[in-house]
Regions:
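N-terminal maturation segment of proteins
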Residues: 1-413
Length: 413
């Protein structure tokens, strides 16, 4: 067998990775990416499939080993909370019925909080004033979005002008590896609108789902989310924790663990991390719209986008209706159309995501991640401190608890 092209895993990292591959046998898709030694993957895939109950015991052994090891506090916190999440997944795989809110807490180190509908009503009232035309706000919202729809070919042209600017601005926050790269592809029949597959060695493949309309007004945000300074940037920089610092757990990316809250928080804040509102207006009006052959009012559209942030908790509330309150599909779709201002087709696509066994709790990572990380960044005393905090999130493996503690002590990072 040829030598592995990357460093070996440390014992604790190896135990963590082995357990993750064992969980993947029962929950396909649990591993979002692996870029450690190929021999470790090959050995794990060749091993007999262990029962979830046996894997629960291994998760307990891993937690005990983490507690006994001489580790920096931040690494211990990361490993321990990831192990707790794996143990919770194994409990469900073993047939245990975990209440939905407890499941969210164990998987993600956050609470499954319901957003008051009064907040949605206030956002909808603001949108009623901002959106052109007359009639129901939801219909006007859909019509407003649809006027900015571009074809996949048009989106490809926009990618070519948007991504270089996002990358340039990202490098004002943190240096990027010289050989990093992202490939963009268009796909269909997926439960999400866009997805980053991190391949290791500073490479990503980003897939955009053509089942859903691609809007020029949202494309900068989507590309920032998936690429610069979002998922691709974070994964490329955190891979260095494995390659340069021997942290084997950073050779693998796992779904349904606390790292997802931080990752989605980074991604949902990515566009505003590199553009202030005035810069975004200028970029859209001077670069994006001419390239798309569109005309518009970027200042108004950005104001509409800001008002839409008040609807960020709608999907999470819908998930609570479905999984916690036991409401039916039609009621959940009606909730999404009423408060999310979605078309019925798009609402049913959202329902597909929150009903999927792998993704059923994941919806909380977006809302909670944006809120938690956004509050910490907003509390920084100045723009340079905000950039430093965002850089920390991109380069250090931290948990939601770490961010909450950082806010409590308010360090200048």
């Amino acid at each position: 067998m040829p030598a592995d092209p990357v460093p070996p895993l440390d014992p604790l990292g190896a135990a963590y990775v082995d357990l993750a591959f064992a969980v993947e046998r029962h929950a396909p898709g649990f591993i979002d990416g692996y870029f450690g030694p190929p021999s470790v993957r090959e050995a794990a895939e060749a091993a007999p499939t262990a029962a979830p109950a046996d894997l629960q015991r291994r998760a307990g052994d891993l937690t005990a080993a983490i507690d006994a090891a001489d580790l920096p506090d931040a690494r211990r916190d990361f490993l321990r909370r990831q192990a707790v999440a794996m143990a919770a997944t194994l409990r469900r795989l073993a047939g245990e019925a975990i209440p939905y809110r407890e499941e969210v807490r164990l998987l993600y180190d956050i609470e499954a909080e319901q957003t008051p509908e009064a907040r949605f009503e206030a956002a909808i009232a603001e949108l009623d004033d901002l959106l052109p035309g007359r009639g129901p706000v939801g219909e006007r919202m859909v019509a407003w979005r649809d006027q900015f729809t571009v074809t996949p070919e048009g989106a490809r042209r926009l990618i070519d002008v948007i991504v270089p600017e996002l990358r340039r601005r990202t490098e004002t926050i943190v240096p990027l590896p010289a050989d990093e790269a992202v490939e963009f592809r268009f796909v269909s029949d997926r439960p999400w609108s866009g997805y980053n597959w991190y391949l290791g060695n500073n490479r990503s493949r980003v897939e955009l789902n053509t089942d859903l309309p691609i809007h020029a007004t949202r494309l900068t945000d989507l590309l920032a989310h998936e690429g610069y300074p979002g998922h691709h940037t974070e994964h490329a920089l955190k891979e260095r924790l494995y390659l340069d610092h021997g942290r084997g757990e950073q050779s693998i990316l796992l779904i349904n663990t606390p790292e997802c809250v931080v990752s989605e928080g980074i991604a949902t804040l990515a566009e505003e991390a590199v553009f202030n509102p005035g810069e975004l207006v200028d970029f859209r009006s001077e670069v994006v719209y001419p390239a798309a052959g569109l005309s518009g009012d970027p200042a108004r559209e950005i104001a509409i986008g800001r008002a839409q942030r008040g609807l960020k908790g709608v999907d999470a509330n819908a998930a609570l209706l479905l999984h916690d309150a036991g409401r039916g599909d039609d009621e959940v779709v009606a909730y999404l159309t009423r408060y999310g201002l979605e078309s019925e087709a798009r609402a049913r696509h959202r329902l597909r995501f929150i009903r999927d066994p792998l993704w059923r709790a994941y919806i909380f990572t977006y809302h909670a991640g944006h809120g938690l990380l956004g509050r910490w960044l907003a509390a920084a005393p100045d723009a340079e401190a905000r950039r430093a905090r965002f850089r920390t999130l991109l380069t250090e493996a931290v948990t939601p608890t770490w961010v909450r503690q950082a806010m409590a002590t308010d360090p200048i990072v």
